[in-house]
Structures are given as structure tokens and as C-alpha cells.
Amino acid sequence: MVLVKICGLMHSEDILAVNTAGADFAGFVFAPGRHQVSLEQALALNQLLHSKIKTVGVFVNEPVAEILAIYQAGAIDVAQLHGKSTPAEITQLQQAGLKVIQVFERQAIDLTSMADYLMVDSGKGSGQLLNLKAIPHISRPLILAGGLTPLNVRQAVQLVQPTMVDVSSGVETNGHKDADKITQFIQQAKEDIIYEDIK
């Protein structure tokens, strides 16, 4: 069954929604943008999060030392890396105990990446859905992000067969997380699907 990450969590109501709906991963954005949270905010939200939900920190070209400081403070379990990341940096994070997601925005997936998960994303919270039929089936753990909503996630899972799906703005109403949309998204993503090879 596909895993679900709800990203861009900022408020206690967001945490309640993901706890209730049964998300697998919760995303805190440390990179600049409208969903950005501070370390203090992330720690406070983490206290409210169900213990079975793993936390992901979203970073853009952040120095390894800064990421490790946030991890060592207890705010995150996984680092999601946008921008340029070297194999040495990824390995350094992993050796410290972090799982690593490397993000590929509108570019070919690097199957030689050292990361634990490879993410394909339409880029920078654009809300644009990728050409799902162009995404190759790979043996590595794959995360699908960008433009997903409760209305299209089931088809996306069927077409791409990812390990995980990731959503932020697709479960928002007027710029705020919508508990009903979060529940619908997770239900649709995790609904029993018979995978078929779709040409």
C-alpha cells in the first residue's frame, strides 16, 4: 500500500488532521516560502504528532550542518533535499541517522543517487501535475509529488506505482490545510488498487 506524506504543516489543527486521517509522514518546510516554519515551531508541532508518523524536513541547498542541527534537536527523521546535493553530503546525513529524499524537479531521475528515496516533483509548489506516463517505473523507492489532489491521486498511484505520494497545496482551501481534503486524499491514495501496466 502506498505511503502518504502531507507537507507544509504549520498549525496545531494541521497536526490534528494528519493524526486523524492516518498519514505516514508529516512535512515541515524549513526553506523560505509561505509554509516555512522555525525549529521552535517544528518542535512544538512534533510534540502533538502521533508517534507512528515520521517527520520530514524540507530544505533547499541548506548546509549539512544546519540540517544536522535540526535533526539532532529532535525535529525531523528524514531530510528532503531540493537543489544541488553531493553524494558526500547525502552520505554524511545518512551516517548521522537521517533518511534522505533527493528531489528531481522537471529533470531525469539519477538512479545512482545515494538517497533512500527519489522524488519526482513538478517544482516549487507549482501545483502542476507531471506527465505521469513519462515517469519511468524504477526499482528504487519513488515518491510522486506536484499537482496531486484527492481527485487525481488514485489514478496517479495506479499509473506510476510509487512508494509514496506527497501533497501540500492539493489538500488546502484558501491557503490553509483542509482536514476533509486530507482525509479524502489519504483514503483515495490508499484505496486497494490492482496495478496494471498502462501503455
Swiss-Prot record:
EC number: 5.3.1.24
Matches recorded under Gene3D superfamilies: Aldolase class I
Keyword Amino-acid biosynthesis: yes
Gene Ontology terms describing biological process: L-tryptophan biosynthetic process
Pathway: Amino-acid biosynthesis; L-tryptophan biosynthesis; L-tryptophan from chorismate: step 3/5
Catalyses which reaction(s): N-(5-phospho-beta-D-ribosyl)anthranilate = 1-(2-carboxyphenylamino)-1-deoxy-D-ribulose 5-phosphate
GO molecular-function term, one example from the UniProt record: phosphoribosylanthranilate isomerase activity
Keywords associated with the record: Amino-acid biosynthesis, Aromatic amino acid biosynthesis, Isomerase, Tryptophan biosynthesis
Annotated transmembrane regions: none
Source organism superkingdom: Bacteria
Name of this protein: N-(5'-phosphoribosyl)anthranilate isomerase
Designated gene of the protein: trpF
